[in-house]
Every structure is written in structure tokens, then in C-alpha cells.
Amino acid sequence: MSQSKYRQLDVRAPRGTTLTAKSWLTEAPLRMLMNNLDPDVAENPHELVVYGGIGRAARNWECYDAIVKALKNLESDETLLVQSGKPVGVFKTHENSPRVLIANSNLVPHWATWEHFNELDAKGLAMYGQMTAGSWIYIGSQGIVQGTYETFVEAGRQHYQGSLKGRWVLTAGLGGMGGAQPLAATLAGACSLNIECQQSRIDFRLRTRYVDEQATSLDDALARIKKYTAEGRAISIALCGNAAEIVPELVKRGVRPDMVTDQTSAHDPLHGYLPKGWSWEEYQQKAESDPQGTILAAKRSMADHVQAMLAFHEMGVPTFDYGNNIRQMAQEVGVSNAFDFPGFVPAYIRPLFCRGIGPFRWVALSGDPQDIYKTDAKVKEIIKDDQHLHHWLDMARERISFQGLPARICWVGLEWRQKLGLAFNEMVRSGEVSAPIVIGRDHLDSGSVASPNRETEAMRDGSDAVSDWPLLNALLNTASGATWVSLHHGGGVGMGFSQHSGMVIVCDGTDEAAARIARVLRNDPATGVMRHADAGYEIAIECAAEQGLNLPMVAATQGNAK
């Protein structure tokens, strides 16, 4: 069998209510797989790359075709198994089991290196699934906008008395994840300077309204920042260039941003971070001809970038890693104090995780934006008193352009996910929305990831690297009846540095779906509360007790035991 990773084909998910598979439970993963490769969604769809360096939706185009065929023929009591983007088996299960089970990029720990993975990838034996690329629930840059927004808002609360008006953020990377940063900063009230080395990515963000304008030079960018901050306007500015050159230059000039982070694809030095002085074309060529030399050159450039971030940190500028493992890469080439500035999770997000709050998302399979607007209204109706959340939904409707099938991201926790899912299912049943809705989340969630340099950095009990938790999350979601469940390795921070799981559940308006939703959308966020309660976080222990969790080794929950 040939193993083509390139095909000149534009893929788009079907819209409307006509099925191309045998039920909505198999139509949903089919549409979401296709949606991941929509040219308006994916970063490089003709090569099956969705986002995050080489995060793919299928191993090769032959595997993609086979997955599509399998999903179209899948019966309501069968389960498709996908191994690193390749469909490997269809098995008889039962109607409440997942229709698809996915395992991507998983390697035995001793061999879990980029070097070994790249050898397997070259042989057609593996696929890097990132987080939502290989699990078919990527929704474009919107998927991380609210998390980035919440991070910036919390940083403003901690460092600037709750307001980012007249402030500016320095960052880099405008890919599928990093592309959320300029809009998130704007929504949080700040200006931003966003460095990106590929003009095509800047064009994509300008077209989708994630970035407001592009500067012609560093001097031009700084002049715009000075003007807009003085006026109290929140405008995002893109600058085409290499962060490893521009960020140190800003330090040299004595420029002082109000916040510094980075979201380049530093997790993958072979494909995701342009070495200083190289063109993108040269980078791609050398990645093939001299991979080890290319990796070293990329890491040395990251070291310069991180040293500049450390300089800002030492000036007292709030500086944080936004989860791309750039500190680790710099440390590996001699920046011994790379971890002096924190990651964003321990600095700003962990209290949310303790309550099971994370990136809940849903997609209208109809393709009709009105279905999303109706669900927005339903969220406001159910969560009546959360004005911060209402403000987010209003801003999202006004500012966020849908990419592919209409979708919404909304950070909610254990208290609300089940209620929202059941309400959405009822909207499908009653015809209030025109077709079923799928509910999923990022793997970046409170109970679904072990990543010592990101989500589980600096855990109170030192359990940063314990990866039993995402495995238990995947097993529980499978037992609870999620429509598809995924278990990945290496997302966000690269091979050897993370394990994580995902789930998606379909709201098709049936009683059977309601029962599955009730189980999945309680149990999934509950694993996050459990994980943090087990680590000794008081917020999580209180949440577990309040929400009726039965955690045998957490005394505060024993009143919930039957």
C-alpha cells in the first residue's frame, strides 16, 4: 500500500440533516474528522496537518480513505479502533460503547523520543496526533481563545489591579494554537505584538480576524504599540520575523512590555521552530537532509529566545511559558535557569482545574451558525449568575469567526457540564436546533493530562509526572459511553513529555443519548476534581464534597459514600 501524506484535495464536512453514515453516532466522528481537514480549519490540510507542527488527523491519505469507509459502514453495535491515524479493526461491542477508540503517538517510555518517533513516522508506522488533531475535535483557533483570555485576565488581576487597558503583551507564534493569542489579548483589553516567521500564517489570522493589523518593521510595530496603549485601545499587531532575533533585540533596546509569553511550536524543534538566519524553505530542506543539525540549530535559537524572556522576567515583567516546552528545549542546550519563569497553569489556571473547569466545547453538525447562537442563549439561561461567562459568550459571538462547522468554546466545570449537555440534547429532541450537536474538549483539561512542564507542573504533592490519571480518565469515559475516546502521547510539549486523553459525546436527542451524556459529562470533569483533591488542593477537596464525589481516600467526601 502506498503511503501518501500529500493530496491536492479540499475536504469539507457535510452539512444539514442528510446522513452519509448509518447513524448520527457514526456520522458525527465522520464529519468531525473531515472538519479537522477543512481548509478554513487546518494549517496544512493537503498534508493532513491540522495544527501544532505535524499534528495530523490521519496517518496518510490511504488511511484517511479507509477511516471514512469504515465510519460509513459502521453498525450501531460496532467499534472502530484507530492506531496512530490508521484504522486497524472493527469489533462487535454494544450500542452504549464508544463508536471509535483512538490511540495516537504512544510509545514505551524509554523509547518515547522525537528521534525514535521520527524514525517510525518515516516508515509509516506512527502519526503525531497532537491533542485534538488526531482525536477529531479541533475547532480552529477558537479552541484555545478562551483559555488564553482567562490566562491574560488572571495575569491582569494579579499584576495590574484587574485591568490591562493601556498595557501590551509580547508573544510569538501565530499557528493553530498561537493564533488565538492576539484575539485573546484584545478581548482581555490589552494590545499585543505577535511575532510570526511565516507570512502565510499572518495572512490566515488577518483573514479570520484573529489579528487586527500587520506592521512593516519592528520600529513600525513599536510605534503602533506606543500609540494604541496611549489611547487605551486594545489592538493586535502581527510582525513577520524570527522571535529568536526580535525578542533579544527588544531586550537590547530596553523596551519593556507589560507581559511576555510565547506560543511557537517549540515542542517540535525539527518542524516547528525556525533557527535564526534561516528561511522557512531552508529549514524544511535541512530537516530532511540533516535532522540532528537542524534540531540543534533550532534549540540554540530557542535558547536565545528564552534568555531574552529571562531578562524580561528579571526586570519584573510578568513572563510565563504558555505550554510549548520552550524552557525544556533551552535547558537542553545550556540555559540552566530556563525554568526560573513559571508555566501558565501553576501561575494562573490551576484553581480552575481544581473545580473541574476547563475547555468545554461543542459543534453544530448542521453547519448552521444559528444552532450555536441558540446554544449560547441556553448556556446563559442555565448559568444565570455568571456575568464573566456571559461577557465571554457575547464577545465570542461578536469577535470570533467560525472556522469550518460552527462551534463554541466555553470554560465550565463539574457543576455545569452535565446540565448543559442534557439541555443541548433536549434542544435536538425538540427541534430547537436543526441537527445533533457534539460535545468535546481539549485534552488540556483538569483530569485528562499528565505533563510536568505544562498542565501538571509544580503539583503540590510532587506528582507532576504520574500518568495514571489520563489513563483512568480514558478508561472511565469509555465505560461511561462517550461516542469516541482518545489516548495520546506528546501533545503540546512534544514526545516524552506528556500523556493525555480526550472524549467526544453526541447529543442526538434520544433518551439513550441523555443517559450517556449524564454519565460522561459528570464523570469526565469529576476525574479532574479527583486528581487535584488527591494532590491535596483544598479547592478541589471542597468541590468534591459539594458535588457529591465519593473519593475513598479523601475524608471530606466520605459522607457521599453509600
Curated annotation (Swiss-Prot):
A Gene Ontology biological process annotation? L-histidine catabolic process to glutamate and formate
Q: Which residues bind NAD(+)?
A: 52-53, 130, 176-178, 196, 201, 242-243, 263-267, 273-274, 322, 492
Cofactor comment in the record?
A: Binds 1 NAD(+) per subunit.
Q: Which reaction does it catalyse?
A: 4-imidazolone-5-propanoate = trans-urocanate + H2O
Q: Which GO terms describe its cellular component?
A: cytoplasm
Keywords, A to Z, come to: Cytoplasm, Histidine metabolism, Lyase, NAD
Q: Which cofactor does it need?
A: NAD(+)
Output the superkingdom of the source species.
Bacteria
Subcellular localization is given as:
Cytoplasm
What EC number(s) are associated with this protein in UniProt?
4.2.1.49
Q: Spell out the SUPFAM superfamilies in the cross-references.
A: Urocanase
> Which GO molecular function terms does the record list?
urocanate hydratase activity
Output the InterPro entries linked to this UniProt entry.
Answer: Urocanase (IPR055351), Urocanase-like (IPR023637), Urocanase_C (IPR035401), Urocanase_central_sf (IPR038364), Urocanase_CS (IPR023636), Urocanase_N (IPR035400), Urocanase_Rossmann-like (IPR035085), Urocanase_sf (IPR036190)
Q: Broadest EC class?
A: lyase
Metabolic or biological pathway, per its Swiss-Prot or TrEMBL entry: Amino-acid degradation; L-histidine degradation into L-glutamate; N-formimidoyl-L-glutamate from L-histidine: step 2/3
Entry annotation: catalytic residues: C410
Q: Which family does it belong to?
A: Belongs to the urocanase family.
Q: What does this protein do?
A: Catalyzes the conversion of urocanate to 4-imidazolone-5-propionate.
UniProt name for this protein: Urocanate hydratase
The record lists the organism as Klebsiella pneumoniae subsp. pneumoniae (strain ATCC 700721 / MGH 78578)
What is the primary gene name for this protein? hutU
